[in-house]
């Protein structure tokens, strides 16, 4: 039997846990929003999974991003990356978004395979769309002016910057992009935004 442990995160983790449970998958959640914790602490979870001989494969599902501050698990501030790294032998596979190098190094040292969702171009692009739409929603709430005919600055022209610039242009904004490379500026200008190369 395959079992999943999901830790922290935001409502995306909640919905993923609910979906997996609907599919008949055994999922243990810890500090996932609006999900009931089966265990009261991380050490209890890792020990329970390490000692359960009925489980064929133990998968640890971490949030996107794994750690916003680089130290603690996103949505679970009492749990640090080093706590997870010290318990990896309880698991057969680790998944998460933007896995910190300290965690991937620990996985490699423990012989535990890992997968970073954000290394998948399709997932990263869909995340960029959600991030861009979130930025636009924040701008609506924080500004008294319309986006149409306004001047907007987008710093960077990676996945998120590219999607954000295009959405703002479609909404009628005058968009300027700052980018580190001539190539990124060229791409921004092809997309109808003006561009200033950052030095």
Where are the regions that the model predicts?
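N-terminal glycine-/charge-rich "phosphate-binding" loop or analogous flexible N-terminal tail
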Residues: 2-51
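Glycine-rich adenosine-cofactor-binding loop
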Residues: 4-15, 20, 146-169
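Alpha-helical segments flanking ligand/cofactor-binding loops in enzyme cores
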Residues: 18, 85-86, 105, 166, ...
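NAD(P)-binding Rossmann-fold cofactor-contacting core
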Residues: 23-39, 171-189
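Hydrophobic beta-strand scaffold residues
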Residues: 27, 114-115, 175, 194
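Short amphipathic alpha-helix with an adjacent loop that forms part of the alpha/beta core around
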Residues: 45-56, 82-86, 198
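Glycine/serine-rich phosphate-binding loop and adjoining beta1-alpha1 elements at the start
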Residues: 60-149
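Residue-level detector of conserved catalytic or cofactor/ligand-binding positions
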Residues: 190-199
């Amino acid at each position: 039997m395959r079992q999943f442990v999901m830790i922290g995160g935001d409502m995306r983790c909640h919905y993923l846990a609910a979906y997996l449970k609907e599919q008949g998958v055994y999922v243990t959640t810890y500090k996932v929003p609006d999900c009931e914790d089966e265990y009261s602490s991380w050490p209890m979870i890792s020990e329970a999974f390490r000692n359960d001989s009925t489980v064929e494969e133990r998968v640890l599902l971490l949030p996107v991003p794994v750690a916003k501050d680089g130290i603690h698990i996103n949505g679970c501030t009492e749990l640090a990356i080093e706590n997870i790294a010290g318990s990896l032998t309880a698991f057969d596979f680790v998944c998460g978004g933007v896995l910190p190098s300290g965690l991937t190094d620990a996985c490699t040292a423990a012989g535990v395979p890992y997968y970073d969702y954000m290394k998948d171009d399709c997932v990263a692009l869909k995340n960029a769309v959600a991030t861009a739409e979130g930025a636009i929603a924040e701008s609506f709430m924080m500004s008294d002016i319309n986006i149409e005919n306004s001047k907007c600055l987008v710093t960077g022209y990676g996945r998120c910057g590219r999607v954000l610039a295009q959405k703002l242009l479609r909404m009628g904004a005058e968009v300027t992009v700052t980018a580190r490379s001539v190539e990124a500026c060229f791409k921004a200008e092809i997309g109808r935004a003006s561009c200033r190369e950052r030095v």
